[in-house]
Amino acid sequence: MSTWFMFMFQESNSYYADNLISFHNMVMMIIIMISTLTVYIILDLFMNKFSNLFLLKNHNIEIIWTIIPIIILLIICFPSLKILYLIDEIVNPFFSIKSIGHQWYWSYEYPEFNNIEFDSYMLNYNNLNQFRLLETDNRMVIPMKIPLRLITTSTDVIHSWTVPSLGIKVDAVPGRINQLNLISKRPGIFFGQCSEICGMNHSFMPIMIESTSFQYFLNWVNKQI
């Protein structure tokens, strides 16, 4: 989860988040190198005493500053397309979970497990030993290291189901069903929030996921049934 004065990404807990962070680091390195080169050229032009008033064109320079950006864009393009494909491609999910957005809470359904369903509301942040605006009365429980399919929609306005540590952000749109892969690498509790302004209590729509062992997940399912 995010902490005060945190400028980096949250600790990754999915393979998609790992890929996104690696891609971000690569793009940032390219941006830093381009910015450094640009600043150096500008300073050099201002500080050197040489000038050529008759230099009107240089085909070699024009070829270089056309080809190099094309190469850089291709270097950025292919990893980006690969990550987009991996996130959107649903490959043999073990089961599906449906997430339904409401103003201003989430509902969850487990169709393959006797159609378990429950609502998830934010807890009063005045209670002690809880994270402000992040704790919910019912957690979405998933087994770790097992590929799942998340299906999301909405009953009223557009919401966005977002869990940064899992590298997930998908819009919940009324009358439309969106889906994506969901997999957790290790056990823990992970927090997210609605990331689409959806009305007065938009800030009070937390998402709380508990990732646990498969045996514990089955025990939880039996208790819900």
Swiss-Prot record:
A GO cellular component annotated for this chain's UniProt record is:
mitochondrial inner membrane
Chief location of this protein?
mitochondrion
Q: What keywords appear on the UniProt entry?
A: Copper, Electron transport, Magnesium, Membrane, Metal-binding, Mitochondrion, Mitochondrion inner membrane, Respiratory chain, Translocase, Transmembrane, Transmembrane helix, Transport
Q: Enumerate the PROSITE patterns for this protein.
A: COX2 (PS00078), COX2_CUA (PS50857), COX2_TM (PS50999)
- Residue ranges annotated as transmembrane are 26-47, 63-82
Instruction: Give the source's domain of life in one word.
Output: Eukaryota
Q: How is the cofactor bound?
A: Binds a dinuclear copper A center per subunit.
Localization terms from the record: Mitochondrion inner membrane
- Any one GO BP annotation for this protein: ATP synthesis coupled electron transport
Q: Which residues lie on this side of the membrane: Mitochondrial matrix?
A: 48-62
What residues does Cu cation A1 bind to?
H159, C194, C198, M205
Q: Which positions in this protein are listed as binding Cu cation A2? A: C194, E196, C198, H202
Q: Which residues lie on this side of the membrane: Mitochondrial intermembrane?
A: 1-25, 83-225
**Listed GO MF terms:** copper ion binding; cytochrome-c oxidase activity
Membrane topology qualifier: Multi-pass membrane protein
Q: Which Enzyme Commission number(s) are on file for it? A: 7.1.1.9
* Function in brief: Component of the cytochrome c oxidase, the last enzyme in the mitochondrial electron transport chain which drives oxidative phosphorylation. The respiratory chain contains 3 multisubunit complexes succinate dehydrogenase (complex II, CII), ubiquinol-cytochrome c oxidoreductase (cytochrome b-c1 complex, complex III, CIII) and cytochrome c oxidase (complex IV, CIV), that cooperate to transfer electrons derived from NADH and succinate to molecular oxygen, creating an electrochemical gradient over the inner membrane that drives transmembrane transport and the ATP synthase.
Q: What is its quaternary makeup?
A: Component of the cytochrome c oxidase (complex IV, CIV), a multisubunit enzyme composed of a catalytic core of 3 subunits and several supernumerary subunits. The complex exists as a monomer or a dimer and forms supercomplexes (SCs) in the inner mitochondrial membrane with ubiquinol-cytochrome c oxidoreductase (cytochrome b-c1 complex, complex III, CIII).
Q: Which family does it belong to?
A: Belongs to the cytochrome c oxidase subunit 2 family.
PANTHER family documented for this protein? CYTOCHROME C OXIDASE SUBUNIT 2 (PTHR22888:SF9), CYTOCHROME C OXIDASE, SUBUNIT II (PTHR22888)
Name of the protein in its database record: Cytochrome c oxidase subunit 2
**Native organism:** Apis mellifera ligustica
Task: Kindly list the organism's lineage.
Answer: Eukaryota, Metazoa, Ecdysozoa, Arthropoda, Hexapoda
